[in-house]
Regions:
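Intrinsic-disorder-associated, low-complexity terminal segments enriched in Asp/Asn/His/Tyr and depleted
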Residues: 16, 27-28
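Intrinsic disorder/low-complexity segments
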Residues: 29-33
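Fe-S-dependent hydro-lyases/dehydratases of central metabolism
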Residues: 42-939
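Cationic, low-complexity basic patches in intrinsically disordered or flexible, solvent-exposed regions
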Residues: 22, 35
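Intrinsic, low-complexity polybasic segments
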Residues: 1-2, 10-15, 19-21
């Protein structure tokens, strides 16, 4: 029985969302240390409920308190047609309303959004929890440890620095495809992973024991977003406080941009920079502009042969064209009645690629089926449904359409098999056009002279040649697709049919399978498809991000040499979500996103230059050509395998050991009982960053930037990969030189991502992407610049250190969509540590702009159509930025350009410090300084 009734909260207390375990995780409580459980929760002495909206919900005889949106509507006005995502924000405000940091006016601003379907108001938001991965998590824990040192300097106690909301860190970013195509690939890659990362992992285990509310999902378990979707996420969370159990929406910030994957099951969350996440976990409300909400109406059903991957690439192309940066996208329409959560999660996952803050699907019957399949507790499922219905968050076919800022519509029956590439995820191309489009790109954007397109090169010691367009990496990878049984089973069936016909992968293709969850192995084994994938070289290489984030591992040396010696444009085909240039492999210049079954098909074909829809994949054992149509499974074949081989029990089994980890994890020894971390000066992985050196209780006054030199002039679409690469470290780079000086061999360099706990390496890696092009040094790729005056060409890091020694501040100029891609806080941290005081561009991607402010770097945008080109910026100028002393959110500042010929121009620029809170962060030198001083004063 489910019923809602009025109720009230006795006393002045308010909900305190403690560390609520996922409902099917009771058996793991013993694995969580007492320290992690003690002091859990984030809402302290707030929630005064000025509007009187507390109510009680009864589910199977158990009562839950909640903050009723229906009751709020009686005081604030009708909210029935608010987008569901904004209703979640409204509930958050009601629950935290304390009359100061969060007020009734904030709630009124959400309701007022309905008047124009837009707003210029900012409101505070506090997520229920934080999700981290290890590349961002290690520097996050480093920062927390450094803050403990900092608060001691200010006279406080180290235990004042603790996460106040639950934090889950999933180790998924470090495994690399060192070994592939063998039966023991998984075991050998795990061994190598621990050899490389034992120091980092020991540090994380220290953090797990030292900090409250901090859990670690060990390596070899899965990808954070898939673990979040299948296990950590609850849709509705509960907490026991003040003698009552409270229910509230599951919301989160993630330190990875693809946190939005969990939007597919009705959980509102998005990626933020590690800096912002650290502030949120330390109890700070995060101010956000009430977003525009774009409604995306879905109708029809996917046709035979089209996959969820094809759907999301189509959605990404449409939304990029429309322009949704900084906006919520909310999906609705009749197609949702039969659109599985796996497909929804694929669409939600790629919100960063289409530019939105999130890609949200409301809770409905389909979501409940997913919760049941994945092993959530039956009472929790009933609670989710009852709560969603009581709050108007539940979607039915008959639910009236919400009010949206703007709308798009897609008939799923029009979706066709597709790829996206060769450099951007929004560059979708129909599969039938892919070969022709690639040949055009070869000469257009990839720089191959027309008379060299047919070049073939011998591979030493092998009996084959390779040429432009040959596929050298075929990777089934990424939570985007490995969370989706439909496309993984399809890949297995393609492998089965190809194997039966005697086809094999081309010998120059490095093949791999890296599921985002161990459940994938369960159903592939149960169906017998693992054997078919293994036969084509798609053995499981690890449970982690691997190729999707650039951890593709080395190609065979002879193949890599043939590519580099002959300047070949080699290709990767991967079931990932990003394909930026230089991301996947240093030997690969063209990267195509594809569904898992197409990844298998391209491994068979071996090239992008042939039309895979009309030309044979190869010759079968009977001597006849085998075409894509011969091996492609029907929807009915896929559905039959899933119905027989995917079960709730598989999720319960695998997630029953989610905190266990491999034997190497269990063997790690850590020092416990220390309030501050004992830094090892000789460590090349974990170092105490200088952020809080010399910190005082009061910040110094801010002022104008004068006499600045230009460190780099960059083009459009500069990604956080360009600014702070995650991939391999070159011996010849400043970071490589640093490691060699410390007796680290090149074989043990690991990646920039794995070294993010060491600021010395990350500073040297800033702007060090092998494909970045600084317009100050035309024709040169890599992190180079000119030292001005004098024009000496040198690595960006070396130039920055020269300027720092002279006390000269630095500025970076760039074009549109600066900072697109991953929510990589080191792209801002490294920028700051190089001495860059301001970044002047045409437009920013959302997360990176926020991160720059969080590190005390001024983000500025040109006005009135001005660009670096129209202003003639060459890098020889001296720059002043005036008006900073009177900084206000969104104000104009003056950019003064002193040219080499003695002329001076002054132009207005918009200060993208967007909120009053951000102004405070900037005045303090960054968000962590602001939080630390607040903690010290409160002690």
């Amino acid at each position: 029985m489910v019923e809602a009734k009025n109720g009230s909260l006795c006393g002045a207390g308010a909900p305190d969302p403690g560390r609520a375990e996922p409902p099917h995780a009771a058996d793991h409580t013993r694995q969580i240390t007492q320290r992690q459980v003690r002091g859990a929760g984030g809402m302290k002495s707030v929630g005064q409920d000025s509007l009187g909206v507390q109510r009680t919900l009864s589910v199977d005889g158990k009562e839950y308190g909640y903050f009723s949106l229906a009751a709020a509507a009686e005081k604030l006005g009708d909210i029935a047609r608010l987008p569901v995502s904004l209703k979640v924000l409204l509930e958050n405000i009601l629950r935290y309303e304390d009359g100061s940091s969060t007020t009734v006016k904030d709630a009124e601003a959400i309701v007022a959004w309905l008047e124009t379907a837009s707003s210029t108001q900012e409101v505070p938001f506090r997520p229920a929890r934080i999700l981290m991965q290890d590349f961002t998590g290690v520097p996050g824990v480093v920062d927390l440890a450094a803050m403990r040192d900092g608060i001691v300097r200010l006279g406080g106690e180290p235990d004042r620095v603790n996460p106040l909301v639950p934090v889950d860190l999933v180790i998924d970013h470090s495994v690399m495809v060192d070994v592939s195509g063998t039966k023991d690939s998984l075991e050998r890659n795990v061994e190598i992973e621990f050899e490389r990362n034992g120091e980092r992992y020991t540090f994380l285990r220290w953090g797990q024991s030292a900090f409250d509310n901090f859990r670690v999902v060990p390596p070899g378990t899965g990808i954070c977003h898939q673990v979040n979707l299948e296990y950590l996420g609850q849709c509705v969370w509960t907490a026991d406080t003040g003698g009552k159990t409270w229910a509230y929406p599951d919301t989160l910030f993630g330190t990875d941009s693809h946190t939005t994957m969990v939007n597919g099951v009705g959980i509102l969350g998005w990626g933020v920079g590690g800096i912002e996440a650290e502030a949120a976990m330390l109890g700070q409300p995060i101010a956000m502009l009430i977003p525009d909400v774009i409604g995306f109406r879905l109708t029809g059903t996917l046709p035979e042969g089209a996959t969820a991957t094809d759907l999301v690439l189509t959605v990404t192309q449409m939304l990029r064209k429309r322009g949704v940066v900084g906006k919520f996208v909310e999906f609705f329409g009749p197609a949702l009645d039969n659109l599985p959560v796996a497909d929804r999660a694929t669409i939600g996952n790629m919100a960063p690629e289409y530019g939105a803050t999130c890609g949200f699907f409301p809770v409905d019957r389909v979501a409940m089926e997913f919760l049941r399949l994945t092993g959530r507790d039956e009472h929790r499922i009933k609670l989710v449904e009852a709560y969603a219905k009581a709050q108007g968050l539940w979607r039915e076919t008959s639910t009236p359409d919400p009010v949206f800022t703007d709308m798009l519509e897609l008939d799923l029956s029009t979706v066709v098999p597709s790829l996206a590439g060769p450099k951007r995820p929004q560059d979708r191309v129909a599969l039938s056009d892919a070969a022709a489009a690639f040949k055009t790109e070869l000469t257009k954007s990839l720089g191959v002279p027309a008379n060299d397109v047919g070049t073939r090169a011998a591979v030493a010691g092998r009996n084959f040649e390779i040429g432009h367009g040959d596929v050298v990496i075929a990777a089934i990878t990424s939570c985007t697709n490995t969370s989706n049984p439909n496309v993984l089973v399809a890949a297995g069936l393609v492998a089965r049919k190809a194997r039966a016909k005697g086809l094999t992968a081309k010998p120059w293709v490095k093949t791999s399978l890296a599921p985002g969850s161990q459940v994938v192995t369960e159903y592939l084994n149960a169906s017998g498809l693992s054997a078919d994938l293994d036969a084509l070289g798609f053995q499981t290489v690890g449970y982690g991000c691997t190729t999707c984030i650039g951890n593709s591992g080395p190609l065979d040396e002879e193949i890599a040499d043939a590519i580099e010696d002959n300047k070949l444009v080699a290709v990767s085909v991967l079931s990932g979500n990003r394909n930026f240039e230089g991301r996947i492999s240093p030997n690969v210049r063209a990267n195509y996103l594809a569904s898992p079954p197409l990844v298998v098909a391209y491994a068979l074909l071996g090239t992008m230059t042939q039309d895979i829809t009309t030309e044979p994949l190869g010759t079968g054992s009977d001597g006849k050509p085998v075409y894509l149509r011969d091996v492609w499974p029907t929807n009915a074949e896929i559905a039959e395998v899933i119905s027989k081989c995917l079960s709730r029990e598989q999720f319960l089994k695998r997630y029953g050991e989610v905190f266990k980890g491999p034997k190497q994890w269990q063997a790690l020894q850590v020092e416990t009982g220390t309030g501050t971390y004992r830094w090892n000066d000789g460590s090349t992985y974990v170092k105490n960053p200088p952020y809080f050196d010399g910190i005082t209780m009061e910040p110094k006054p801010i002022g104008d930037i004068t006499g600045a030199r230009i460190l780099a002039v960059l083009a459009d679409n500069i990604t956080t990969d360009h600014i702070s690469p995650a991939g391999s470290i070159k011996k010849s780079s400043p970071a490589g030189a640093y490691l060699l000086e410390r007796q680290v061999s090149a074989a043990d360099f690991n990646s920039y991502g794995a070294r993010r706990g060491n600021h010395e390496i990350m500073m040297r890696g800033t702007f060090a992407n092998i494909r970045i092009k600084n317009e100050m040094v035309p024709g040169v790729e890599g992190g180079m610049t000119r030292l001005v005056p004098g024009n000496a060409q040198m690595p960006i890091y070396d130039a920055a250190m020269h300027y720092q020694q002279q006390g000269i501040p630095l500025v970076v100029f760039a074009g549109k969509e600066y900072g697109m891609g991953s929510s990589r806080d080191w792209a801002a941290k490294g920028t700051m540590l190089l001495g860059v005081r301001a970044v002047v561009v045409e437009s920013f991607e959302r997360i990176h702009r926020s991160n720059l402010v969080g590190m005390g770097v001024l983000p500025l945008t040109f006005k009135d159509g001005a660009t670096r080109q129209s202003l003639g910026i060459t890098g020889d100028e001296v720059i002043d930025i005036l008006g900073i002393a009177d900084l206000r959110a969104g104000m104009d500042l003056s950019l003064v350009i002193h040219r080499a010929d003695g002329k001076t121009d002054t132009v207005p620029v918009k200060c993208r410090v967007d909120t009053a809170d951000e102004v405070n962060y900037y005045k303090h030198g960054g968000i962590l300084h602001y939080v630390l001083r607040g903690m010290a004063k409160a002690a």
